[in-house]
Design a protein with these regions (language model features):
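Soluble non-cytosolic domains of exported or imported proteins
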Residues: 66-74, 205-210, 214
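Active-site scaffold of zinc-dependent metalloenzymes
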Residues: 174-207
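Sec/Tat-exported extracytoplasmic proteins
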Residues: 76, 80-87, 163-165, 196-198, ...
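Solvent-exposed loop/turn segments at secondary-structure junctions
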Residues: 55-58, 108-110, 165-170, 198-201, ...
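Propeptide-to-catalytic entry region of secreted or membrane-anchored zinc metalloproteases
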Residues: 1-155, 164
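The catalytic-center signature of Zn2+-dependent metalloproteases
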Residues: 206-258
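Extracytoplasmic/secreted envelope proteins and their assembly/folding machinery
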Residues: 73-76, 80, 191, 213-216
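Structural recognition of the beta-strand scaffold that forms the well-ordered cores
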Residues: 48-54, 101-104, 158-163, 190-196, ...
Length: 258
């Protein structure tokens, strides 16, 4: 059986067992869920600065995995349509406006102006030229900490989005299309990782990945939303909706692909 298109659960469990920082943050988050913190009532829109790291393999801008600025911008537009439920867009479905908007960063951590798009050749890291980046240590590909350390912006001031040519040696094809961590990691891993051809709504895209839903899905994870089938393996009774599945009571616990 091949790997699922979302590699978040595997990456999350691996880091949970190896990082005391990440485990502590997850424990704090679950405590917040259990306390059922009330929703803010002023509905102020939260603006999140985004830096997109295009980690290519030497291609010119706009060729192969070194995607164009236009493709990056299309991803941000579609992401906001989904999170803000923009009327008349593909995001205007059954969901709700979550009052979060994503904008390309305008300053670097050092305070200098930026477009919010950073390009770096990842082939200096062993294995990246051949297999891209590995979402977990037991899978093919370059070590993600080594690759992301070339470019990541540390701290909690930005959402790092890493665009890569391959994940786990999949040649940009099937298997994992993207992965994230459900909250801050405290190191270079922090953020969202996606295949270049599953990112955006225009540009170098593959069939079935033209609505930018992979980015929307993985950003949801980064904002601490789990799968509805998280840690479920049978049709047991739902029980406490704050501790089962995605820990959110507006969605029932489900089985993966079931």
């Amino acid at each position: 059986m091949g790997l699922p298109p979302c590699g978040t659960d595997a990456a999350h469990h691996e880091l949970l067992s190896s990082s005391a920082f990440y485990a502590a943050r997850q424990s704090a988050m679950e405590g917040t869920w259990s306390a059922e913190q009330p929703m803010l009532e002023d509905f102020e829109v939260l603006e999140v600065p985004v830096v997109v790291h295009v980690i290519h393999r030497g291609s010119p801008v706009g060729v192969d995995e070194n995607i164009s600025d236009a493709q990056v911008l299309s991803a941000l537009v579609a992401l906001n349509e989904d999170f803000r439920k923009v009327a008349g867009s593909n995001g205007d479905g059954l969901g709700v406006d979550v009052f979060v908007e994503f904008v390309l960063a305008k300053r670097t951590p050092e305070g200098t102006p930026t477009t919010g798009i950073v390009r770096v050749d990842g082939t200096v890291v062993p294995g990246y030229a051949e297999n891209g980046l590995a979402s977990s240590s037991f899978l093919p590909g370059a070590d993600q900490v080594a690759v992301k350390s070339l470019t990541t912006w540390y701290g909690e001031d930005y959402l790092n989005v890493f665009v890569v040519p391959e994940i786990n040696g999949n040649n940009g094809g099937g298997g994992v299309q993207g992965f994230s961590y459900t909250g801050p990691t405290g190191d270079a891993r922090d953020g969202v990782t996606l295949l270049y051809n599953a990112f955006g709504t225009t540009g170098t895209l593959k069939p079935g990945r033209t609505l930018n839903r992979t980015l929307t899905h993985e950003v949801g994870h980064h904002l601490s939303l789990l799968h509805t089938f998280y840690d479920t393996d049978d049709c047991e009774a739902e029980g406490d909706c704050t501790t089962a599945g995605d820990r959110v009571c507006d969605t029932p616990v489900t089985l993966e692909n079931g």
